[in-house]
């Protein structure tokens, strides 16, 4: 869990420093740039000869511009109007990632930073759980990987990945109609 959180913090920090865009972490593993998903992170744990290894996959949309069928998606370019040379971008990111991974923060600090960076934290949002929509407020993520949400009809509850969906794109669509 802490490697997931720390990786998300590293990616968020890199993109925020590079672009000056609003960069938030959408629990558990996406980066939101100016309201659009610009990055996804996947971490897989493997055991080989009694040693645990982690494979970290980070997909950053850098220059893509066509998201006509993906209303929640964006890229560094569409979120910031900044264009980067992909090789230079990749080299900068790689150096930043390695330096931060080698100097890992204490777990309590990671959890605090992660929670400060959560997308839609302490804001009324629309969630879908078991095909039912209701309002709720993201309170925090915990050390076990759960997201705590205060739901309008059910009170404070914890959720694991894929047990609930934040429908953040509906908010933008509603805002655009007003």
Question: What residue ranges belong to the model's regions?
Answer:
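Long, positively charged amphipathic alpha-helical accessory segments at protein N-termini or as interdomain linkers
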Residues: 2-23, 33-178
């Amino acid at each position: 869990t802490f490697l997931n959180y720390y990786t998300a913090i590293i990616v968020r920090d890199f993109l925020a420093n590079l672009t000056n865009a609003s960069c938030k972490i959408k629990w558990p593993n996406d980066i939101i740039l100016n309201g659009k998903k610009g990055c996804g992170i996947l971490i897989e744990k493997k055991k080989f000869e009694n040693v645990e290894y982690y494979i970290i996959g980070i997909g950053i949309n850098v220059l893509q511009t066509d998201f006509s069928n993906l209303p929640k998606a964006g890229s560094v370019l569409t979120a910031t109007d900044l264009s980067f040379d992909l090789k230079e971008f990749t080299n900068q990111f790689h150096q930043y990632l390695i330096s931060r991974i080698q100097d890992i923060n204490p777990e309590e600090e990671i959890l605090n930073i992660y929670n400060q960076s959560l997308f839609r934290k302490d804001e009324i949002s629309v969630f879908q759980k078991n095909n039912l929509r209701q309002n709720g407020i993201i309170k925090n993520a915990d050390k076990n990987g759960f997201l705590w949400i205060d739901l309008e009809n059910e009170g404070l509850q914890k959720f694991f990945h894929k047990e609930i969906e934040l429908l953040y794109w509906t908010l933008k669509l509603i805002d655009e109609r007003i």
